[in-house]
């Protein structure tokens, strides 16, 4: 009896593979990897907060937050990292607001960056689908979900009601994109804005536009918010920014990366390197002085950053960088000649939010409650 069932199952598996191709069905243990294949976010602190060392390949990432909080900066750093590894990045600029000079300052090779500024939401998502289907890009950024305006709304009159149009558009697009992204190993970053729900007396009144589909399909959701200003004397030169991992399917969520975003320069990568190195005693801090291997490298954080940033101290910078990554258990940085487009599949490291001591089931995450546009 048992042998007959096994023979029937084997025959069914062979037929499925013949009809739909090898790999269309498999036993779970055949595809288990101990490490998720990732691409660095461009921020060490964010790599650590994500738990796996970067953005998981083949997945959807949502980055949301208030205006001018650093959402585009986070996405551009990812594009720069992909290009450093020899990959290709594409940017769907639905807001028509991408600053090429700023992108270049963050390390993006603007000559190689694929850019599209679509007229309608449908056009932007069709372009995104074609790019991902090609299997030739490694990162797709859509900026932003709120700016993906349906064609019917653009062609209609001011004041016309278009309930659920954008939610329906996003739901349909994500159903198509999710499988293709997984197959090609492409990372898709959706930048999103926030809105306020009218009439909410208790809980968080904030929500994100575009319906609920993106929240479900996202493997990682990042909330980006400014927390303080950074001043040089009386001049404001940047913002201290908190990036909270509000959803994570590949590692425990709810971790926070606190970074400095400097105007015109992006995330202060050397600054966060020093902070992490001090936490692990790789760099010693005594009073205002910072020292590495017994040698003083600067009085005050700004001077220590300048010391590490100087070309003559590149060796020390690289040593500290490697030590920090090893200490935090996120492995070695991949060689620049490795193709990030290699489609190495991995199994989700399932995480239960109830295992996290900071988890609060009553907390209101932006977008948890339905609005008129959230019917899909």
Swiss-Prot record:
GO terms for biological process: DNA recombination; DNA repair; SOS response. It holds the Pfam family RecA_C. InterPro entries: AAA+_ATPase (IPR003593), DNA_recomb/repair_RecA (IPR013765), DNA_recomb/repair_RecA_CS (IPR020584), P-loop_NTPase (IPR027417), RecA-like_C (IPR049261), RecA-like_N (IPR049428), RecA_ATP-bd (IPR020588), RecA_C_sf (IPR023400). GO terms for molecular function: ATP binding; ATP hydrolysis activity; ATP-dependent DNA damage sensor activity; damaged DNA binding; single-stranded DNA binding. Residues 331-350 have a biased composition (Basic and acidic residues). It is found in: Cytoplasm. GO terms for cellular component: cytosol. Its main location: cytoplasm. Residues 316-376 are annotated as: Disordered. It comes from the Bacteria. ATP binds at residues 65-72. HAMAP family: RecA (MF_00268). Can catalyze the hydrolysis of ATP in the presence of single-stranded DNA, the ATP-dependent uptake of single-stranded DNA by duplex DNA, and the ATP-dependent hybridization of homologous single-stranded DNAs. It interacts with LexA causing its activation and leading to its autocatalytic cleavage. Belongs to the RecA family. This is Protein RecA.
């Amino acid at each position: 009896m048992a042998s007959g069932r096994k023979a029937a199952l084997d025959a069914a598996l062979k037929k499925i593979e013949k009809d739909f191709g090898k790999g269309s069905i498999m036993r779970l243990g055949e595809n288990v990897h101990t490490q998720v294949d990732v691409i660095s976010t461009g921020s060490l602190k964010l790599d650590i907060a994500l738990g796996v060392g970067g953005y998981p390949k083949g997945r959807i990432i949502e980055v949301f937050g208030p205006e001018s909080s650093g959402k585009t900066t986070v996405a551009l750093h990812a594009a720069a990292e992909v290009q450093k590894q020899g990959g290709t990045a594409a940017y769907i600029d639905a807001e028509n607001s991408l600053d090429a000079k700023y992108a270049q300052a963050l390390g993006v090779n603007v000559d190689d960056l694929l850019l599209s500024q679509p007229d309608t939401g449908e056009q932007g998502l069709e372009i995104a689908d074609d790019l991902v289907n090609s299997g030739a890009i490694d990162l797709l950024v859509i900026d932003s979900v709120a700016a993906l305006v349906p064609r019917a709304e653009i062609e209609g009159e001011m004041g016309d009601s278009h309930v659920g149009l954008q939610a329906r558009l996003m739901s349909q697009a994500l159903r198509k994109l999710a499988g293709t992204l997984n197959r090609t190993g492409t990372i898709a970053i959706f930048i999103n804005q926030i809105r306020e729900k009218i009439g909410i007396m208790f809980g968080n009144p904030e929500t994100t536009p575009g319906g609920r589909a993106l929240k479900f399909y996202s493997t990682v959701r990042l909330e980006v918010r400014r927390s303080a200003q950074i001043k040089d004397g009386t001049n404001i030169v940047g913002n201290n920014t908190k990036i909270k991992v509000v959803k994570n399917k590949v590692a425990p969520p709810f971790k926070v990366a606190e970074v400095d975003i400097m105007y015109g320069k992006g995330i202060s990568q050397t600054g966060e390197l020093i902070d992490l190195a001090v936490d692990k005693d790789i760099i010693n801090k005594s009073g205002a002085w910072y020292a590495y291997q017994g040698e003083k490298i600067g009085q005050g954080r700004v001077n220590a950053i300048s010391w590490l940033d100087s070309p003559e101290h590149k060796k020390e910078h690289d040593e500290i960088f490697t030590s920090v990554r090893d200490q935090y258990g996120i492995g070695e940085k991949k060689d620049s000649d490795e193709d990030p487009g290699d489609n190495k599949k991995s199994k989700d490291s399932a995480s239960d939010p109830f295992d996290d001591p900071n988890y609060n089931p009553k907390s209101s995450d932006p977008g948890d409650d339905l609005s008129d546009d959230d019917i899909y």
